[in-house]
Each structure stands twice: as structure tokens, then as C-alpha cells.
A protein has these predicted regions:
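Conserved class I S-adenosyl-L-methionine
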Residues: 88-97
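Conserved SAM/SAH-binding beta-strand->alpha-helix loop
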Residues: 121, 167
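S-adenosyl-L-methionine
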Residues: 122-158
């Protein structure tokens, strides 16, 4: 990722503020940010209320510490995806973080969704499972701990929707891995979050746009809880 892009003048305030908060947390021995968010949800969210969990995570991100969740600004995009998916879709998420997007997709798409979410961080797995439990969605969302490149080959069946929101340099190789293992089929929708210029998404975008395998749409957005330009790429396997 082109980290220098985060140092451009329009992005500098966000970058320095986030780095300051991370340093303070490290020096004071605070838990990782996902675990802080988990504790906040347990304290303030209403059990069994998915929207309350999302609202509480939004409040944490706006008032306590920034979170790299999708945030509320992209909920309309998730709702739009429902029109492209069959009833009771199988969803694969790469990158759980705090469980925000898993909860949002389960709440906004279809009550019969079944989501498998792969996450490499143990803290993120713990936080995601706890937040999903508070939301009352543990029976519909499964979290798998491990590197995506190791877990993907162990998956079975096909997925109607794939949500990419993990390490950006893994977007392209993991998508190709999903293809080679037959985990996506014609009509499968692949949503790649954070493909704005700041994330140096060119290898992934070049692949979905020019491989001839996908129809694809680019939607502008902002990085969650900021005004920094971002984008989402929505691709459908032909």
C-alpha cells in the first residue's frame, strides 16, 4: 500500500491523530482497539438489537477511537446489493475487524443470510464474536481464525457475495484463489471496500476490469468516519 498517500496535506490530520491515539494506547497499556470497542459495546449496546450494536460502534468510532469498519455511510450500498442476490445468500467476508460489516449485512440483506468471516487477528476474532453475540446473530455468522490464503482452500460450496475488507494487497490473489477453488460462480458478487487512490488499488482494479471475467462498477465514497475520498468496487463474475 502506498503509505505516503496518507501523508498528503488533506489526509495528514487524520493520519497523525490516529497515530497519536495508537501511541497513547500502547504507552498506557490499553487493550487493542477492537477489544476496546468490544468492551464499549458490552457496556452500552442493547442486547439482541443489531442496530444498537452498530450505533454503539459508530459512537465509539466518532467519540473514542477511530475504527476501520465500513461505517454507516455505506449501508445504502449494502441494501442495494440485496437486489442482486438470491434468497438466503451465502456470504464470505475476508476481514472481520469488529464484526460491523457482518452485522450490517445480516441486518440489511436477508434474515436467512449465512456468513463466514475469515480474520487473521485473534483480538479481532474475539471482538467480532462478542459483538455478534450481543447483536443476537451468532447463529447466522461464523468466524474462522487464520490467514485468508490458508483458510480459503478449506471452504466448501459456493458464495453468492464476497466482501473484501482485509489487507489490500491480498485482494487480487485471494480473489483468484476463490476462483481456482470453485468458491464463486457465475453471478457471484464481489465487493471490494477501500479501493480509493489512497490505498493503491491498481493491481486489483486492473484485474477485475480487464481480465474479461467480470462486469464491474466503481462507486465513490469516503473512508469510514472521515471525509477522505475512498471508493468501493462491485464486480459480478460472468
Amino acid at each position: 500500500m502506498g503509505m505516503w498517500r496518507f501523508l498528503k496535506p488533506r489526509n495528514l490530520g487524520f493520519t497523525l491523530g490516529n497515530a497519536r491515539d495508537a501511541l497513547i494506547d500502547r504507552l498506557t497499556g490499553r487493550p487493542s482497539r477492537p477489544l476496546q470497542a468490544m468492551a464499549y459495546v458490552k457496556q452500552y449496546a442493547t442486547p439482541g438489537d443489531s442496530q444498537s450494536v452498530l450505533d454503539t460502534l459508530d459512537q465509539f468510532a466518532n467519540e473514542v477511537r477511530w475504527l476501520m469498519s465500513i461505517g454507516p455511510a455505506k449501508n445504502d450500498l449494502i441494501q442495494d446489493l440485496g437486489e442482486q442476490l438470491p434468497s438466503g445468500p451465502r456470504i464470505l467476508e475476508l476481514g472481520a475487524y469488529c464484526g460491523y460489516s457482518s452485522i450490517a449485512m445480516a441486518m440489511l440483506l436477508d434474515r436467512d443470510t449465512q456468513t463466514t468471516s475469515i480474520e487473521v487477528s485473534a483480538d479481532c476474532i474475539e471482538a467480532s464474536r462478542a459483538n455478534v453475540e450481543v447483536a443476537g446473530l451468532s447463529d447466522r455468522i461464523e468466524f474462522v481464525h487464520g490467514p485468508s490464503t490458508d483458510v480459503i482452500p478449506t471452504l466448501k460450496g459456493t458464495f453468492d457475495l464476497v466482501f473484501l475488507d482485509h489487507w489490500k494487497d491480498l485482494y487480487k490473489p485471494d480473489l483468484k484463489l476463490l476462483e481456482s477453488h470453485g468458491l464463486i460462480t457465475s453471478g457471484s458478487v464481489i465487493v471490494a471496500d477501500n479501493v480509493g487512490d489512497i490505498f493503491a488499488p491498481e493491481p486489483y482494479l486492473d484485474y477485475v476490469r480487464n481480465s474479461g471475467k467480470f462486469t464491474t462498477e466503481h462507486r465513490t465514497a469516503t473512508i469510514e468516519y472521515t471525509s477522505i475520498p475512498d471508493a468501493v468496487e462491485i464486480s459480478v463474475l460472468k
